[in-house]
Amino acid sequence: MIITRTPFRVSLCGGGSDIKSFYEKHGGCVLSTTINKYMYITSHPSFDKKTTVLKYSKTETVQNINDIEHNIFRECLKQEGLEGLEITSIADVPSGTGLGSSSSFTVGLIKNLKCYKREYISKPEVAAAACNMENNIVHTTNGKQDQYAAAFGGLNFYKFNKDGSVDVEPVLMDHEAFKQLEKNLIMLYVGGEHKASAILEEQSKNIVSATDKEEGQKRIMEMTYDLKYELEHNNIDAVGKILDENWKIKRTLASGISNPQFDEWYERGIKAGATGGKLLGAGGSGFFLFYVPEEKQEKFRKEMNDLPEMEFKFDHQGTTVIFVN
């Protein structure tokens, strides 16, 4: 049996610039961290060696892997030449909530299957393989940031070059400032599910066709460099202001990113003591992330208590094999 554990990510700034239509023209960058909420993938030989069994939100039992409905499962197994396995996925957080879970699944599955075959795969290799699987084989349009975050783990600055290559730079901070940043980020669940690919496809088309949308995305990219600078100088209170400006621009880039209810929750959060925030992921559902100075947190939690809080810590490892037998 092989078990892999792959973290979910929290994107702080830059999302959208990792879309091919943008980074091929301008380059792109994202600053994100992974958290201690995970996707677990287990694999072991099926009792019936001629049968492949997949357990996720549903159960599939097939004799031929071409009959698998789940496109990532099917194409990864075909790519690795594997069948006759029983594979299960279990997640700490539901899909469609803006934490990059679909890419955490893909990264974790590729890592798991390589380990099953006793083949080593590095973090850059598994990230690139997941990008290829999602963007070129099953044709989703969710960019590159989620796969790299899931593979590498930690607080990183990801630079997406025009030629398609990706540079990964750890964001280095004093330990005390790093822990305070972790404390000052509060995540509230606002419910629902989204299809990130649909929102990102609209955003991608808007960036290409509308000058104001493209300029907005370029400004978000500039803010990502600003955020990197401020964090590396341990100025964590700058995070709130940058998140605030980032969200005000991002919500204009596609129709499905925000709605009046989300806008109302955001304004309430600011009035309750947050200095900035954003809806995580492509938008449309999931979690609001707020930056709240520690001295304002008691008031903030009291006034926002109708939205469930999900406590978290930063993850530092990325995708990992945690059990082999």
Predicted segments, located by residue:
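Short active-site loop/helix that positions an aromatic residue
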Residues: 25
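Aspartate-rich (DDxxD/NDxxD/DxxxD) Mg2+/diphosphate-binding motifs
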Residues: 94
